[in-house]
């Protein structure tokens, strides 16, 4: 694993519709520099392949908790890793900020005093339009 940096930060990142070519340049840069990645179960394996082998990668569904406690555990892992000085990515399917503000992650991180940044993902409709070709 990478040596922790002086100040940890959490990046709430959208994986878009699953095509790595549709990630922003910033998203790819941050993903490759991450020390800890917590990802949704449905994030494309092609996107997960961009993560360096030295990075601690965890599928949030494998944290071993029931659905009711899962979000609290995710919050706990994000906060702990950032407080330890790590660069942390919370990688979500599509866009990280649906109607509930990343499942309350922005609010929880702010209340905990953890530095965070949102890196949007391409919406599925935009990805479909970008992939449209003529024959």
Describe these PLM feature segments.
Residues 130-135:
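Short, glycine-/small-residue-rich phosphate/pyrophosphate-handling segment
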């Amino acid at each position: 694993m990478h040596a922790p940096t002086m100040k940890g930060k959490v990046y709430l990142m959208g994986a878009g519709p699953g095509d790595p070519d549709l990630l922003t340049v910033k998203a790819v840069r941050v993903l490759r520099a991450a020390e800890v990645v917590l990802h949704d179960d449905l994030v494309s394996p092609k996107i997960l392949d961009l993560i360096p082998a030295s990075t601690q990668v965890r599928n949030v569904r494998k944290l071993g908790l029931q659905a009711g406690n899962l979000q609290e555990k995710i919050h706990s892992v994000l906060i702990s890793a950032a407080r330890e000085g790590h660069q942390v990515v919370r990688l979500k399917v599509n866009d990280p900020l649906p109607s509930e503000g990343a499942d309350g992650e922005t609010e929880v991180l702010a209340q905990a005093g953890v530095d965070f940044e949102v890196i949007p993902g391409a919406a599925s409709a935009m990805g479909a339009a970008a992939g449209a070709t003529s024959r």
